[in-house]
UniProtKB/Swiss-Prot annotation:
GO cellular component: cytosol
Cofactor(s) recorded in Swiss-Prot or TrEMBL: Zn(2+)
Binding site for L-cysteinyl-5'-AMP: C45, G46, I47, T48, T60, N83, V84, T85, W232, G254, S255, D256, V286
A family per Pfam: tRNA-synt_1e
Full protein name: L-cysteine:1D-myo-inositol 2-amino-2-deoxy-alpha-D-glucopyranoside ligase
EC top class named in words: ligase
Catalytic activity, as annotated: 1D-myo-inositol 2-amino-2-deoxy-alpha-D-glucopyranoside + L-cysteine + ATP = 1D-myo-inositol 2-(L-cysteinylamino)-2-deoxy-alpha-D-glucopyranoside + AMP + diphosphate + H(+)
InterPro entries: Cys-tRNA/MSH_ligase, Mycothiol_ligase_MshC, Rossmann-like_a/b/a_fold, tRNA-synt_1_cat_dom
GO biological process: cysteinyl-tRNA aminoacylation; mycothiol biosynthetic process
Main function: Catalyzes the ATP-dependent condensation of GlcN-Ins and L-cysteine to form L-Cys-GlcN-Ins.
Motif extent ('HIGH' region): 47-57
Motif 'KMSKS' region, residue numbers: 292-296
Amino acid sequence: MRSWTSPALAPLPASGLPLRLHDTRTGRITPVVPLTPGTARLYVCGITPYDSTHLGHAATYHAADLMRRALRDSGLAVEMAQNVTDVDDPLLERADRDGVDWRELAASQSALFAEDMEALRVIAPETYRSVSEAMDEIIAVVLALHARGRAYPVEAADAAGPDWYLDLAADGALGDVSGWSEEQMLAVFAERGGDPDREGKRGRFDPLLWSAEREGEPAWDAGVLGRGRPGWHVECVCIAEEGIGLPFDVQAGGSDLIFPHHDLSAAHSVALGRPFAAAYAHSGMVGYQGEKMSKSLGNLVFVHRLVREGTDPMVIRLVLMAHHYRSDWEWTDGELDRAAERLKSYRLAARRGDHRPATVEALRAALRDDLDTVRALEALDAWAEGGSSSGAETDPAAPGDVPTAMDALFGITLQS
């Protein structure tokens, strides 16, 4: 699947200092030490392409983009994989509602997402695969789990054959990533795609591994499991393994994926006898009109609509930078006005052309400290006002080109 064209990367020499990132699993901020020396490997969960990119999506992929920029600045090569969930219930339901082929809907919305990412100057992943493209690999993994005795059937009245579930019992307690109690899990499992009360399941949190073919739905042949389509969680395991290998360094995504998706993706990998991710970094939720911004609620602010109405994409990035990536925050129309004023002041400051190594170092220090964009903006505001957040400039040989640093570290170009 075509992703998008990456922006030209500004030529800022690497600092060589490590990124320190909050790991959801441990609850601590620790340095990212690659499992493969010299190369950091990241996986970010992709969209289900049945609607346009909203600011909640943008916040997630902005955070992942900052991670790879920070890792690049630390002197590492970076390999990233990202999926597109183009075979899933919400997409199939939307296609049926609108009377279009599910493949056409997925293709059109994936193309729009790519346009939005390109406008926001997000670096494209090295591996970008849809579920439908990766179906052969997914089926191979599902059959491998069956061969290991980890899959069991549950009768489905509306299908010709049974659905298949992953038996989690052999691996002990669920929740290695989230650390949640069973009560916390049950509170959200059903609304996030689970079916804890389905008759015939061995465990309430056992995830759907292979859904039997239903009338009007796409289906593929999975040998002894019959025709059908994969469950959600196994898909990311397969695309990650194919793209960057298992285990990898950082799993990224929105905080609404901590449970069940990331807990259960890790459980699938463990069931295969392979570790999954070394660390987990999750971005907060963006709210609007008092609720989490989501397709199901319809309270969405779309990136492409803002851009088409004349909003500079760099203003959108500055809106996202104004909130720490792990924070939940509420969108208001005033966010754009404040960010537009910031961008204007930065462009005026860039025309001065003064050399400020301390500002560049302040930007780097903020980014490598758990992607602290709020602190970075404080340094940029001081620079724009003609001052410095870090004292006098004493080393004229140090990198001091603030616009280049903004581009390389934060993806912000001051070219108008």
